[in-house]
């Protein structure tokens, strides 16, 4: 393990992380853009946008119920556990994720920002009542709001929708404080998440990229570690723990 990399992490004043679908892929949750990605079997425009939901809510809900079932049955992997350990060590201050599962939290991470919402949450299309669910709904029937009776929808951000302003503001505040960012398992193409590491870089901070493949972020990353997030993060945290002891 690169000693300079370990020093960068151990001596960081405010380290944050940005994680994407590649982190949860090792838990059996399909990615969207990998070779075996979810979008290879389904057209995203058919399923993950407001128009598709308005046109055929049952079809969209069936797909999301299937995804929710996968998430609820999945277990955190070595990457999730490693990020939680970095937080326990006092090194990682905040974890920003593009993932809509709760595997970071179940691994023990506490300060997590979900940019794209969560499959654990459903919300009303009319009154905005939202609540957490413990299991995937059985479709049909379509789930209805217990307050106003309107149709419920998954609590995620769809294509064509804006990120909740408070969530994006919080993420921006975190990266503006950061002197190091670990970017793991993300294709670095989905905005505005892809711009977050650039803010750290522009402010003189370091980017540590972890990905099996090169991404648009690779040319400007200070460190690019090739491999699966679970394997790389597990080894990285073991070395960081030693460096801190």
Swiss-Prot record:
Protein name (Swiss-Prot/TrEMBL): NAD-dependent protein deacylase 1
GO cellular component terms, semicolon-separated: cytoplasm
Organism from which the protein derives: Archaeoglobus fulgidus (strain ATCC 49558 / DSM 4304 / JCM 9628 / NBRC 100126 / VC-16)
The protein's Enzyme Commission number: 2.3.1.286
Residues bound to Zn(2+): 124, 127, 145, 148
Signal peptide: none
Domain (Deacetylase sirtuin-type): residue spans on this chain: 1-243
Keyword field contains NAD: yes
Family: Belongs to the sirtuin family. Class III subfamily.
Gene it is expressed from: cobB1
Something else known: The two SIR2 homologs in this organism, Af1 and Af2, display different substrate specificities in vitro. Af1 cannot deacetylate histones but does deacetylate BSA in a NAD-dependent manner.
Main location: cytoplasm
